[in-house]
Swiss-Prot record:
EC number: 2.7.7.7, 2.7.7.49, 3.1.26.4
Region of interest called Spacer, as start-end residue ranges on this chain: 178-345
Residue ranges of the region described as Disordered: 186-273
Pfam families linked to this entry: DNA_pol_viral_C, DNA_pol_viral_N, RVT_1
Family: Belongs to the hepadnaviridae P protein family.
Region spans: Terminal protein domain (TP): 1-177
Region named Polymerase/reverse transcriptase domain (RT): 346-689
Function summary: Multifunctional enzyme that converts the viral RNA genome into dsDNA in viral cytoplasmic capsids. This enzyme displays a DNA polymerase activity that can copy either DNA or RNA templates, and a ribonuclease H (RNase H) activity that cleaves the RNA strand of RNA-DNA heteroduplexes in a partially processive 3'- to 5'-endonucleasic mode. Neo-synthesized pregenomic RNA (pgRNA) are encapsidated together with the P protein, and reverse-transcribed inside the nucleocapsid.
Activity regulation, short description: Activated by host HSP70 and HSP40 in vitro to be able to bind the epsilon loop of the pgRNA. Because deletion of the RNase H region renders the protein partly chaperone-independent, the chaperones may be needed indirectly to relieve occlusion of the RNA-binding site by this domain. Inhibited by several reverse-transcriptase inhibitors: Lamivudine, Adefovir and Entecavir.
Record's protein name: Protein P
Comp. bias regions, Polar residues: 223-239
Organism for this UniProt entry: Hepatitis B virus genotype E (isolate Cote d'Ivoire/ABI-129/2003) (HBV-E)
């Protein structure tokens, strides 16, 4: 006869009609009873032969990916021009006086952030954009390219120009070494004096650093190229004769970098293309040797900057290798040939764009180190997309980076800190990760990009067609033409217009701000926001500012005070270059929603949406069917979040933890499911701990227990000797039930830790319920007044200690000790300070 739910509740002492606690509770530590109950509830984990269940409601195993849904109408979010002030420490010091060592250390960590992986694996460009949506390959390609372009325009990415140089938009930092080695040479007269090594057919002179130049005609590069004149005949002749075997175009691209120390072969392979393009091509077209098959393939390098206006005269020119524009000269192969699309516009714009600033970078290969793809911005906002960057290579394998640990406030610390009668609001930092600048030295390790549309499509469509009559001049150009591609591009043409041409070229980009896909980023963001909040708290001592990652909350005594605080703090953050999203500022009144909890003066509870998820989970939980342990991980993750608010807490979930650890399937018996259901139906708030003096002490030996409650002493013995930790836990439970005190002194570290998961299962569950809301103070055995009674000696009285208890706020480093602050004029308005009135700082 399996154990009924009512009987089980009685065993667990959750019902009123249990006998005296001193008799009942030690029985729960009995191994035999625990084994029998576990067998009755099917908690021992036999090897089950029934097939496992791999899905419960929305929960699948941790590593099985849910199929993402592609939205062709995703909007790319816009990013403000985020530029964090470089002298952020000085700015803060002007605001609040000298900073503490802690704050300075944290702010120095992120100005700039550095990234040193042990080893970096480079992937071919084809893996730059992940084929995550096989039915929307082309659409996803362009949406992702557009997202990357938007990030580059916002100064969040570098664009790799050559092996050793990159360009970016936005304001430069002092650690980004700009290249100013020479200016655009206006006419041929000055070039005649240059030696061959320092110039090559219309490039500016420069010393042999592998880098590109910021020229004074940069803007013309992006618009119609009116200021670029063709070279005169003498120059062309000269460059042609020097560069034997290299086809010399009539126009030269910008910023190409022949290096003085290298020979003609190297120059041919590197300088005959726009900034980074030939290197990209070498990666993208490994089957064409850049040098030997230069004029025949038309694939090896791209000659950009052919004025779009000269479409008519292009037939007389040599074939240029921009894949997109090549269609202009070719015969349509079918009704769905890309030639029809390319001929829609006269001016397709430049093949490549360059940033306002050019900087020197460490040697960066034409490869990527992580793939990117798009997903919904969040479950509530499916209209906008979010870029997911997969840099998981740095968290895997033998060369994985062990990311720094940082303090996450636990539930009790949070409650101690934020549970008060303050008014709250939370600030939304827009694109928080993209505030923190990365040193350019990290660029070679954090590369994203794409191989260009032609390669991307070719890799995905295996059935390439070769059209014989065109073989020879334009090999395989029309292989990519297909109805699907044509229709997709025509639709995308409405969205992106002539940018289709720009986006169809290969590109390699490195991160200039910290990306979200690296384990270092959460750590850096947490350090940064906690330092800023520490500064804000000292500037406004009568208020509370607290942050976890990009979630910043402000609290004040009254709504009017909160509004004036909001204005001041917002202005301060804006002056540092931190961008806030005013539309997403939330005013919470007296119950703050933070980190999944609702925190008010009564304590904390889980937010409503989490309660709904738990209800939903129990509704779909199958009984008497083995459930895959990976699904159990998901279930435990959800239930574990709300466990501190239940009667029995984490110990109630121990059978599930055990099955996950042994990688076995778990079967819910009706009684165990009913027990958990009831546990999660009524949630109790976790209250703030109060400081006070400890008056109640407990102690135990394996054979007996003793209590000191004020001047009263009590003792008792156990029927059979018990392990010492179990005995100490029982003594603490007796102290709580006898005295009702919320503060108990004990000399046992396991009881102090309040983790009851290692005790016999039934005892752990019952003790959690009895000791809920109790705070413990450590008292050394020698001074413990309950020590003598536990050894059976009631006559000797040790003096009662005056042991003060201070609630902790964990390692959340809330209170920085303020150095002396220069005196300021007194505030005209005096607000009653919550620090003095509402609660004491720990």
């Amino acid at each position: 006869m399996p154990l009924s739910y009512q009987h089980f509740r009685r065993i667990l002492l959750l019902d009123e009609e249990a006998g005296p606690l001193e008799e009942e509770l030690p029985r729960l530590a009995d191994e035999d009873l625990n084994r029998r109950v576990a067998e009755d509830l099917n908690l021992q984990l036999p090897n089950v032969s029934i097939p496992w269940t791999h899905k419960v409601g929305n929960f699948t195993g941790l590593y099985s990916s849910t199929i993402p849904v592609f939205n062709p109408n995703w909007k790319t979010p816009s990013f403000p021009d985020i530029h964090l002030h470089q002298d952020i420490i000085n700015k803060c010091e002007q605001f609040v006086g000298p900073l503490t060592v802690n704050e300075k250390r944290r702010l120095n960590l992120v100005m700039p952030a550095r990234f040193f992986p042990i080893a970096t694996k480079y992937l071919p460009l084809e893996k730059g954009i992940k084929p995550y949506y096989p039915d929307n390959v082309v659409n996803h390609y362009f949406q992702t390219r557009h997202y990357l372009h938007t990030l580059w325009k916002a100064g969040i990415l570098y664009k790799r120009e050559t092996t050793r140089s990159a360009s970016f938009c936005g304001s430069p930092y002092s650690w980004e070494q700009e290249l100013h080695h020479g200016a655009f040479l206006d006419g041929p007269s000055r070039m005649g004096e240059e030696s061959f090594h320092h110039q090559s057919s219309g490039i500016f002179s420069r010393p042999p650093v592998g880098s590109s130049i910021q020229s004074k005609h940069q803007k013309s590069r992006l618009g119609p190229q009116s200021q670029q004149r063709p070279l005169d005949g003498s120059q062309q002749g000269r460059s042609g004769s020097i560069r034997a075997g290299v086809h010399s175009p009539t126009r030269r691209p910008f910023g190409v970098e022949p290096s003085g120390s290298r020979h003609a072969k190297n120059i041919a392979s590197r300088s005959a293309s726009c900034l980074h393009q030939s290197a990209v091509r070498k990666a993208a077209y490994p089957n064409h040797s850049t040098f030997e098959r230069h004029s025949s393939s038309g694939h090896a390098v791209e000659f950009h900057n052919i004025p779009p206006s000269s479409a008519g005269s292009q037939s007389k020119r040599p074939v240029f290798s921009c894949w997109w524009l090549q269609f202009r000269n070719s015969e349509p192969c079918s009704d769905y040939c890309l030639t029809h699309l390319v001929n829609l516009l006269e001016d397709w714009g430049p093949c490549t764009e360059h940033g306002r600033h050019h900087i020197r970078i460490p040697r960066t290969p034409a490869r990527v180190t992580g793939g990117v793809f798009l997903v919904d911005k969040n479950p509530h906002n499916t209209a906008e997309s979010r870029l997911v960057v997969d840099f998981s290579q740095f968290s895997r394998g033998s060369s994985r980076v062990s990311w720094p640990k940082f303090a996450v406030p636990n539930l009790q610390s949070l409650t101690n800190l934020l549970s008060s009668n303050l008014s709250w609001l939370s600030l939304d930092v827009s694109a928080a990760f993209y505030h923190i600048p990365l040193h350019p030295a990290a660029m070679p390790h954090l590369l994203v990009g794409s191989s260009g549309l032609s390669r991307y499509v070719a890799r995905l469509s295996s059935n390439s067609r070769i059209i014989n009559h065109q073989y020879g001049t334009l090999p395989n150009l029309h292989d990519s033409c297909s109805r699907n591609l044509y229709v997709s591009l025509m639709l995308l043409f409405k969205t992106f217009g002539r940018k289709l041409h720009l986006y169809s070229h290969p590109i390699i980009m490195g991160f200039r701000k910290i990306p979200m896909g690296v384990g270092l980023s959460p750590f850096l963001l947490a350090q940064f926001t906690s330092a800023i909040c520490s500064v804000v708290r000292r500037a406004f001592p009568h208020c509370l500012a607290f942050s976890y990652m990009d979630d910043v909350v402000l609290g004040a005594k009254s709504v009017q005070h909160l509004e004036s605080l909001y204005t001041s703090v917002t202005n301060f953050l804006l002056s540092l270059g931190i961008h806030l999203n005013p539309n997403k500022t939330k005013r919470w009144g007296y119950s703050l929603n933070f980190m999944g909890y609702v925190i008010g003066s009564w304590g904390s509870l889980p937010q409503e949406h989490i309660r709904m998820k738990i209800k939903d989970c129990f509704r779909k939980l199958p009984v008497n069917r083995p459930i895959d342990w990976k699904v159990c991980q998901r279930i435990v993750g959800l239930l574990g979040f709300a466990a501190p608010f239940t009667q029995c807490g984490y110990p109630a979930l121990m059978p599930l933890y055990a099955c996950i650890q042994s990688k076995q399937a778990f079967t819910f018996s009706p009684t165990y499911k009913a027990f958990l259901c009831k546990q999660y139906l009524n949630l109790y708030p976790v209250a703030r701990q109060r400081s006070g003096l400890c008056q109640v002490f407990a102690d135990a030996t394996p054979t007996g227990w003793g209590l000191a409650i004020g001047h009263q002493r009590m003792r008792g013995t156990f029927v059979a000797p018990l392990p010492i930790h179990t005995a100490e836990l029982l003594a603490a439970c007796f102290a709580r039930s006898r005295s009702g005190a919320k503060l108990i002194g004990t000399d046992n570290s396991v009881v102090l830790s309040r983790k009851y998961t290692s005790f016999p299962w039934l005892l752990g569950c019952a003790a959690n319920w009895i000791l809920r809301g109790t705070s413990f103070v450590y008292v050394p055995s020698a001074l413990n007044p309950a020590d003598d009674p536990s050894r059976g000696r009631l006559g000797i009285y040790r003096p009662l200690l005056r042991l003060p208890f201070q609630p902790t706020t964990g390692r959340t480093s809330l209170y920085a000790v303020s150095p002396s602050v220069p005196s300021r004029l007194p505030d005209r308005v005096h607000f009653a300070s919550p620090l003095h009135v509402a609660w004491r700082p720990p």
